[in-house]
Amino acid sequence: MATASPVTDVDVRHDYLLRLGDDALVLGQRLSEWCGHGPVLEVDISLANLALDLIGQATLLLNEAGDGDRLAFHRDVLDFRNCLLVEQPNGDFAQTIARHLLYTTWQYLLLQRLTQSRDKFLSEFAHKAVKEVAYHRELASDWTIRLGDGTEESTRRVAEGLDWNWRFVPELFEVDETLQVAIDHGIAPDPREFEDEYRSAVAAVLSEARLETPAEQRPILGGRRGHHSEHLGHLLAVMQFLPRTYPDATW
């Protein structure tokens, strides 16, 4: 009987680059959907800038993993390794902010530790990206507080956004065999080590916003293994349409 091939350092590094790159790419594409649709001009511009930061991060990571354009535009849904949280629909503005708070709080804590990676590229990337993500986290926190401590409707909407996205948080701290090898080799930080700090940081924002921490729900996992929701398929159909329709086009 054939045995599975052992996971190599090259495989682990490539997979980790895809995880981080796909997170940034998918969330950047999601936020770009707000362009021209923000509740006010200032917010519209802010969300577009967040999207540009994330697409920039994705470009660096996917180009390091291989041909960035091909990885972004010519992979199928099952080949993407992003977490499920970032592919969730924008919903209304409050739901978008809730999703961004939950993701960027995790991303910020991860990048802080990734600066100590033994991998030179990842360490240098983290030193640059953590400054951008600090702003993302601040914006998401500020808007969560404004919405939560605002009108009855804004409070309801952001609470519903948190409830919707909360089930996807446990996946951020899941460690599978591939990630464990990356941790053991000093490539990636162990997310379990900052889960308590993450939950405390989110709880502090929610307390200031006069919001309750959502009740624990059955976690939904699988994004890191290519098991995605239908929402990612719809997103990729839009994002990949031109490159797949005209694969040899140049402009």
Question: What are these model-predicted stretches?
Answer:
Residues 85-142:
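Internal, conserved structured core segments that host functional sites
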Residues 121-185:
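A contiguous pocket-lining binding segment that forms or flanks enzyme active sites
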Residues 27-49, 107-122:
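Helix-loop segments that flank and shape redox-cofactor active sites
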Residues 2-16, 74-100, 147-151, 165-188:
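Acidic/His metal-coordination segments adjacent to aromatic residues that form catalytic metal sites
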Residues 51-77, 141-144:
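Conserved alpha-helical segments that form or flank metal/cofactor-binding pockets of metalloenzymes
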Residues 13-17, 38-57, 96, 121-133:
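Alpha-helical scaffold segments that form or flank carboxylate-/histidine-based iron centers
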Residues 23-31, 57, 61, 103-110, ...:
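Amphipathic, well-ordered alpha-helical segments in soluble domains
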Residues 156-251:
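Extended, helix-rich structural scaffolds rather than catalytic motifs
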